């Protein structure tokens, strides 16, 4: 009971706060400009050389630049090459599937293949982005490009043409994404820290909407630590690159400001409930964090029945399949559209209320987005006007993708419709069908969100608390014969398990406040013992623990186990 009084269970924000929340206050127009230029520049070359058909194909590869935004230049090429290769692959397979669907003599129900392909993409992408804990927009563009490319087969596009022009868009993205490194090689991490300081100051000085400002500050803090880690400035809770030490010091100062003001306002971790994409930041910590475990480790840890990533995948697949079957039965001709709509709502495995709000965002944003598409369609865009429309939508979607979901969808909706070659089809039937599929997918996804695997979060919480205990025991055993610096991987894994356990109990508190009470006291004890162990390692990195120190660590872990 004392633990619950000292660390109260987080309260769910109001629906109004969820509807109007801006998740990030960071400046995004430079990245948005690169995203627009990645379509505009190669598209202009295609038009000038007489290849008007290539504009949509270039767009599939031009999304590559989005995945590199915010990444330090040390890791950006690898991230962009991986994303670009994935985009081109799913687009090429989509065109092959489309040629089979639209072959002469094949009827309406052959579109089921498009739905199955899009569902398979959504399943794989949904699991990967949650297991790896990717930042927004996650893998959404992979699903959108893969599903939409099926519809490109309605034209005379060949796989060879797609590969060439998509690769052109990818190369343009790589050049645009890496060009700033010539003038400002440490720009991404410097801007991440500057954004953090701005968010921390706004949180401290703000007189209203403190919950939203705290969430923005936490989001900026996570982005800053991640940038410093990817830039190899910090490792193992310490500075390893003295040239970047001033950035670490500024980040720590901002973190202290955020934590102190959060304690003064007694907000706790309530701001985590403002979004379905929770940041891996403990609101009470003021130390340099460890880096993330390897991708293989994160995927392996998520590959269990009741994990957040696995349950999210189940919800995505179930809602997508039902949407596809019902949509085709009603005569709709874009099953990929229904899958993408369901995926957008469920892709992060949201809690019940935030997920429902995301569905409302999808509905409101899509209606406005369809109206925007109608205006573009009315004026008969093609060639240069089509290129400008694609680039403008890409620019605006990138501006809002990490800020507000409803506004982002306003621009991603016409972008997806244009890429699916809907500009050449009759307007009224297209609008009716797309709005019908959106409504259908949101209703089905909402039902699945609330009804499927309702007890899984409880089982997952119990499992994660066991994992945290096991990770503490593993690290403690290693410290008997090793220095903390020689067991960095075990320290890193323990931090990951503590953050995972904390993240899960936040979700459980939002959806099932009665069930969370049985885990809360042990949650507090586990977090205290785990960080006590990690702080010892950070304080004494290069020597083995004494017998007295080991006894103190053992007492902390035993107390957590008994809680």
Regions found by a protein language model. Give the residues of each.
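Pore- and pathway-forming membrane helices of multi-pass small-molecule/ion transporters and channels
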Residues: 7-17, 35-43, 47-73, 84-91, ...
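Hydrophobic alpha-helical transmembrane segments
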Residues: 25-34, 53-59, 107-117, 306-313, ...
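Hydrophobic alpha-helical transmembrane segments in multi-pass integral membrane proteins
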Residues: 93-98, 151-159, 374-378, 425, ...
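Membrane-helix boundary elements
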Residues: 81-101, 356-374
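Cytosolic regulatory and coupling regions of membrane transport/channel systems
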Residues: 1-44, 48, 52, 154-166, ...
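Interfacial helix-loop-helix linkers and transmembrane-helix boundary segments
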Residues: 73-81, 159-161, 186-189, 353-361
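Transmembrane alpha-helix boundary signature
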Residues: 94-108, 131-132, 379
């Amino acid at each position: 009971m004392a633990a619950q009084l000292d660390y109260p269970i987080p309260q769910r924000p109001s629906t109004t706060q969820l509807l109007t929340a801006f998740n990030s206050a960071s400046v995004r127009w430079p990245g948005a400009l690169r995203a627009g230029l990645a379509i505009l520049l190669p598209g202009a070359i295609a038009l000038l050389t007489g290849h008007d058909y290539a504009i949509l194909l270039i767009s599939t590869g031009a999304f590559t630049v989005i995945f590199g935004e915010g990444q330090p230049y040390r890791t950006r090429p690898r991230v962009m090459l991986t994303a670009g290769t994935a985009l081109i692959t799913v687009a090429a397979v989509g065109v092959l599937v489309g040629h089979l669907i639209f072959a002469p003599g094949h009827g309406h129900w052959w579109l089921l293949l498009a739905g199955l392909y899009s569902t398979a993409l959504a399943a794989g992408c949904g699991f990967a982005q949650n297991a790896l804990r990717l930042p927004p927009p996650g893998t959404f563009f992979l699903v959108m490009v893969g599903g939409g490319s099926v519809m490109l087969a309605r034209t005379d596009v060949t796989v060879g043409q797609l590969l060439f022009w998509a690769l052109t868009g990818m190369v343009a993205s790589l050049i645009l994404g890496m060009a700033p490194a010539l003038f400002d090689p440490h720009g991404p991490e410097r801007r991440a820290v500057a954004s953090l300081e701005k968010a921390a100051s706004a949180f401290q000085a703000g007189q209203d909407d403190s919950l939203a400002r705290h969430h923005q500050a936490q989001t900026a803090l996570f982005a800053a630590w991640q940038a410093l880690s990817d830039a190899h400035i910090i490792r193992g809770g310490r500075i390893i690159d003295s040239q970047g030490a001033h950035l670490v010091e500024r980040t720590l100062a901002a973190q202290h400001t955020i934590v102190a003001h959060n304690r003064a306002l007694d907000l706790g971790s309530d701001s985590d409930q403002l979004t379905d994409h929770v940041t891996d930041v403990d609101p009470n910590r003021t130390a340099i964090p460890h880096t993330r475990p390897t991708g293989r480790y994160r995927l392996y840890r998520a590959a269990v029945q009741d994990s957040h990533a696995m349950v999210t995948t189940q919800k995505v697949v179930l809602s997508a399949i039902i949407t596809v079957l019902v949509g085709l039965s009603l005569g709709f001709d874009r099953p990929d559209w229904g899958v993408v709509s369901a995926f957008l709502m469920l892709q992060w495995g949201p809690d019940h209320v935030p997920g429902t709000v995301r569905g409302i965002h999808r509905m409101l944003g899509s209606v406005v987005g369809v109206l925007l598409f109608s205006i573009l369609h009315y004026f008969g865009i093609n060639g240069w006007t089509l290129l400008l429309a694609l680039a403008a939508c890409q620019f605006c979607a990138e501006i809002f993708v990490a800020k507000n979901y409803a506004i982002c969808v306003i621009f991603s909706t016409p972008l997806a419709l244009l890429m699916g070659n809907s500009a050449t089809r009759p307007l009224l039937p297209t609008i009716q069908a797309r709005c019908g599929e959106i409504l259908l997918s949101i209703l089905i996804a909402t039902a699945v969100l609330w009804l499927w695997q309702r007890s899984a979060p409880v089982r997952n919480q119990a499992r994660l608390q066991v994992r945290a205990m096991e990770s503490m025991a593993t690290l403690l055993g290693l410290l008997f014969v090793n220095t903390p610096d020689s067991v960095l991987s075990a320290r890193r894994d323990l931090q990951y398990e503590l953050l995972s356990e904390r993240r899960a109990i936040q979700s459980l508190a939002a959806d099932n406040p009665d069930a969370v009470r049985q885990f809360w006291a042990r949650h507090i004890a586990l977090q205290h013992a785990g960080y006590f162990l990690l702080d010892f390692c950070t304080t004494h990195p290069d020597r083995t623990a004494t017998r007295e120190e080991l006894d103190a660590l053992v007492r902390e872990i035993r107390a957590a186990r008994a809680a």
